[in-house]
């Protein structure tokens, strides 16, 4: 095949050049004679024979140099065939490349043949293609890439890319055989000359010339004058992106980046270039920032400063600003670069606040066009830049009407005429940095830049958390190590089984370690940088996040914002940075219960919650008590068509508010033992949410909204109910986790709850927040405010609300911390405080009936709990606990009868609870009672009337004295007598010998 083709082409050249080019004819005749003289063997043999005859290719070279398209077509065709079959003599490689260059300006067929020959030349003559030969091959591709025919230009660009890639692959192969190849070439470095081997020297010269061509400066190795700066930058980007490890190990390449590439890429931020040049420069800058930040800290500082200016500048074109933000987003998303940048610049002595300035720019950027992001009083659903004409669409109805309540809770409250941020219209189909085919800057969605700011906030939180969270776990913890509140390791297995069972995930909970206490050399600097970022940048983070917390965001954007906010707050708390932690918690609290929603709910609901609210004090698990609210919503959907008019809807909590509440609770779970007085933020927020969800006016709102919208009622109620259930579960886990708190932290939690029983404010330091993060002011009312709840007009009503919220929580805390109470001092463990606070409520006739019953019930269960907890303990341990537990029952009874007022039905109900608790203790562990029998008899004796001059019971440290001569034979009431008789019957029948 090869011999035939060559013979035919030579014959054609002889025929066509008889009169026009005698030299070509003579050379062709000689080559044809040489070809015919070769033995007719295999193709491989013919190629090998031809490779030993350098003169054979002369007619083809002459044909290419003749500037005749017809001659050149034959010459190039033959040279291509010889290259493919390795029949081209190596001595003629340079001549062949010169011939290719000479023919590059001829016809389309000739150019295609040249481009087809070059890959084979690279493959079959790779070892020989170096120095000037390499430069010649690259020059051919570069000149053809500037061809006007798109086909030729595209193929030439791909071929040039292939050749450049091969150059760097040869460097990798050479590095693997470095010991066998001497370094013979020296090039200038940053400090001193660098010695290079052959392949590395070629790669250096090619890369340097590409960088020079991008700056439109004269090249030194390859003639690239015909190569456009944009094409040069694409090749440079490909080299750097595809050979990361190679560049790191070759300082001469890094030196070229520093001296040529970085200045060019950085100037694109401050100079005005067209889109094609700018996008390629910023792609390179993005690559260098994310991959070689540590190699060029000084240059990166300048670049980041210009990026900040580009983000903050109104003079930048929208597409340039968007590209700058994309580079910033990628910088934040790559590893821990932002932490390294802070340590390198902001934290250094005399360093510039690079990271701080960048985050401060986010604050200004996020608030520059509030209408575009749909900024309002709270977060809402984005409705899109163009409204829909179909009013029957559920999403459109919710958005246009701004309806609040359970329906909109499932979707989020939307305000009319907002655009907002959504993946449907805020994101371009292709990022700006990837639009290399555009000659003009693309149209950028107005809200695109805000999506990237949200991404930056999320990435920042992730980076901080990845550094800090792994260091907060105590490495020496194991299942055998109890928390501070459990110190009974020597107890038997049966004793441990009798204790209150808690989920295993919280059994090993302990105070998170403070990572800043770690003194390891490789960890401490990064931790100090993280702490510095939070300490100096939290106002900017908070202000930016606060803006978006009240913007119209798509669901996923909002959830990611909350997750990032939660992580940032958690890191601040774990590092014991209390000021930023408290400010962030407060902002999250206000997003969970917006002031305008709280004001509307508390101001509009003046009915007594004791009659309107369906909640039960004894319902410890249904912590937000909204089951009846949801069931009302479901049942009311059936009569929506019968209502002739709808009252104006008022603000209501949404699923997004509940999501914020859940995030706040999760933070309390993660940081609980370290929160201190800040725990009151969590308690107050939970109480406010409970107030709104259980308020009579809120339930009327549900009735209003469901009456007007029925076709999506079930799904909306289900979504709202699911979020409420998630919040309730988080509350349960929070209360459960207190079992592993140190006693001091647990007492703080108790104080956060018990202060509400007497409307006693617990001191909290003022929490600094930036002005940008301040929520709308709460409308004032003419009523006096109690417990921070506006609109509650009477002290009694405030107390009733707080009792219904607090007492069930105290019951949960008591249940979860029974082991703590029996193992520690009563005052240190919080037992004394819990009993005193609940006792004041239970025995006071001025307190609401339901509150008294609930407090008495909690006390009775706690008293029984501590007695049951020590059944398997030694007599010494049991005696003290049994006296304490039974003494509480006696204190309740004594407190009821110590007041100089007539007994009420509530007093008798509480006394009945006490007698039932006593009976339960006797039934379950009466045979293990070693102390407290005097208190038992005193409680039973309280069922009888006493004379007018009878003193109260006298309880000593160990004994209780009952002066029976003052006890009559008449029962206080018949039910009380029956309850006392049951307990006494147990004593007489089973435990008489123990008295």
Where in the sequence are the language-model features?
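Amphipathic alpha-helical segments within extended alpha-helical solenoids and repeat-rich scaffolds
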Residues: 2-9, 38, 46-61, 82-109, ...
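Long, serine/threonine/proline-rich intrinsically disordered regions in eukaryotic cortical polarity
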Residues: 2-24, 140, 440, 650-653, ...
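HEAT-repeat alpha-solenoid elements in large eukaryotic scaffold proteins
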Residues: 13-42, 69-81, 96, 106-121, ...
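Short inter-helical turns and helix N-cap capping residues of alpha-solenoid HEAT/ARM repeat scaffolds
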Residues: 21, 67-68, 106-107, 148-149, ...
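Short coil/turn segments at secondary-structure boundaries
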Residues: 76-77, 87-88, 126-128, 157, ...
């Amino acid at each position: 095949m090869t011999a035939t083709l060559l013979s035919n082409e030579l014959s054609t050249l002889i025929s066509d050049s008889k009169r026009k080019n005698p030299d070509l004819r003579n050379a062709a005749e000689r080559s044809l004679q040489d070809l015919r003289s070769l033995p007719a063997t295999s193709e491989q043999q013919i190629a090998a024979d031809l490779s030993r005859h350098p003169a054979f290719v002369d007619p083809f070279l002459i044909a290419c140099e003749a500037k005749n398209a017809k001659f050149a077509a034959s010459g190039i065709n033959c040279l291509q065939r010889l290259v493919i079959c390795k029949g081209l003599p190596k001595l003629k490689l340079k001549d062949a490349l010169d011939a290719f260059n000479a023919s590059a300006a001829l016809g389309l067929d000739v150019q295609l043949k040249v481009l087809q020959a070059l890959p084979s030349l690279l493959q079959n003559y790779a070892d020989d293609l170096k120095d000037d030969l390499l430069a010649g091959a690259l020059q051919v591709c570069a000149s053809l890439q500037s061809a006007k025919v798109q086909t030729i230009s595209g193929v030439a660009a791909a071929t040039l890319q292939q050749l450049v890639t091969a150059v760097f692959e040869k460097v990798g192969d050479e590095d693997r055989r470095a010991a066998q190849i001497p370094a013979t070439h020296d090039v200038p470095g940053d400090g001193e000359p660098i010695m290079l081997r052959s392949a590395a020297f070629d790669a250096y010269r090619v890369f340097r010339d590409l960088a020079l061509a991008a700056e439109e400066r004269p090249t030194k190795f390859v003639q690239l004058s015909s190569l456009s700066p944009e094409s040069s930058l694409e090749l440079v980007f490909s080299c750097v992106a595809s050979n990361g490890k190679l560049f790191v190990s070759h300082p001469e390449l890094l030196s070229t980046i520093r001296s040529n590439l970085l200045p060019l890429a950085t100037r694109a931020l401050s100079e005005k270039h067209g889109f094609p040049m700018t996008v390629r420069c910023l792609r390179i800058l993005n690559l260098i920032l994310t991959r070689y930040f540590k190699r060029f800290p000084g240059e990166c500082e300048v670049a980041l400063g210009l990026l900040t200016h580009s983000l903050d500048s109104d003079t930048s074109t929208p597409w340039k600003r968007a590209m700058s933000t994309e580079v910033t987003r990628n910088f934040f998303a790559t590893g821990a670069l932002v932490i390294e940048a802070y340590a390198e610049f902001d934290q250094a002595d005399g360093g510039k606040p690079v990271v701080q300035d960048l985050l401060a720019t986010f604050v200004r950027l996020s608030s520059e066009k509030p209408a575009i992001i749909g900024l309002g009083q709270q977060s809402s659903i984005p409705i899109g830049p163009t409204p829909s004409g179909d009013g029957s669409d559920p999403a459109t109805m919710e958005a246009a009407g701004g309806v609040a309540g359970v329906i909109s809770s499932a979707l989020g409250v939307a305000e009319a005429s907002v655009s907002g941020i959504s993946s449907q219209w805020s994101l371009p189909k292709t990022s700006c940095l990837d639009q290399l085919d555009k000659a003009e800057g693309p149209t950028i969605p107005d809200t695109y830049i805000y999506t990237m700011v949200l991404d930056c906030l999320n990435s920042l939180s992730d980076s901080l958390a990845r550094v800090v969270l792994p260091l907060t776990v105590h490495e020496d913890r194991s299942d055998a190590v109890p928390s501070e509140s459990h110190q009974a390791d020597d107890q038997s297995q049966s004793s441990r089984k009798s204790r209150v069972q808690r989920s295993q995930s919280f059994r090993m909970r302990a105070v998170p370690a403070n990572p800043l206490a770690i003194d390891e050399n490789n960890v401490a600097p990064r931790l100090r940088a993280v702490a510095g970022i939070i300490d100096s940048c939290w106002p900017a983070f908070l202000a930016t996040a606060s803006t978006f917390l009240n913007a119209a965001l798509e669901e996923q954007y909002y959830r990611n914002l909350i997750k990032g906010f939660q992580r940032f707050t958690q890191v601040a708390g774990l590092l014991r940075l209390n000021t930023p932690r408290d400010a962030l918690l407060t902002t999250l609290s206000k997003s969970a219960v917006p002031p305008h929603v709280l004001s509307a709910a508390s101001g509009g609901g003046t009915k007594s919650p004791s009659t309107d609210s369906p909640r039960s004090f004894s319902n410890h698990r249904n912590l937000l008590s909204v089951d009846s609210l949801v069931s009302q919503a479901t049942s009311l959907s059936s009569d929506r068509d019968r209502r002739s008019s709808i009252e104006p809807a008022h603000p209501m909590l949404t699923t997004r508010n509940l999501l914020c509440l859940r995030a706040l609770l999760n933070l309390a779970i993660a940081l609980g033992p370290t929160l201190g007085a800040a725990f009151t933020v969590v308690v107050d927020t939970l109480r406010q949410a409970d107030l709104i969800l259980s308020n009579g006016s809120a339930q009327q709102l549900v009735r209003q909204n469901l009456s007007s919208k029925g076709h999506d009622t079930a799904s909306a109620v289900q979504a709202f109910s699911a979020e409420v259930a998630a919040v309730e579960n988080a509350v349960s886990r929070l209360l459960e986790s207190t079992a592993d708190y140190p006693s001091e932290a647990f007492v703080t939690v108790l104080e956060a709850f018990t202060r509400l029983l007497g409307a006693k404010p617990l001191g909290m330091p003022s929490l600094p927040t930036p002005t940008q993060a301040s929520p709308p002011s709460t409308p004032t009312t003419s009523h006096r405010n109690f417990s921070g709840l506006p609109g509650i007009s009477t002290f009694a009503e405030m107390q009733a609300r707080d009792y219904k919220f607090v007492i069930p929580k105290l019951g949960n805390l008591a249940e979860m911390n029974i082991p703590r109470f029996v193992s520690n001092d009563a005052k240190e463990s919080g037992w004394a405080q819990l009993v005193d606070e609940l006792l004041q409520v239970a025995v006071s006739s001025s307190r609401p009936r339901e509150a008294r019953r609930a407090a008495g019930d909690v006390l009775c269960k706690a008293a029984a709990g501590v007695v049951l907890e020590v059944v398997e303990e030694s007599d010494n341990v049991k005696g003290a606990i049994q006296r304490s537990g039974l003494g509480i029952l006696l204190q309740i009874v004594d407190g009821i009868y110590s007041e100089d007022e007539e007994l009420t039905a509530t007093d008798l109900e509480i006394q009945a609870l006490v007698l039932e608790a006593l009976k339960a203790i006797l039934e379950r562990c009466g045979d293990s009672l070693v102390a407290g029998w005097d208190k038992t008899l005193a409680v039973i004796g309280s069922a009888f009337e006493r004379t007018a001059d009878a003193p109260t019971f006298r309880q000593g440290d160990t004994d209780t004295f009952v002066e029976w001569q003052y006890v009559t034979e008449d029962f206080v009431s018949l039910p009380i007598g029956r309850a006392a008789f049951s307990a006494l019957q147990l004593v007489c029948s089973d435990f008489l010998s123990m008295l």
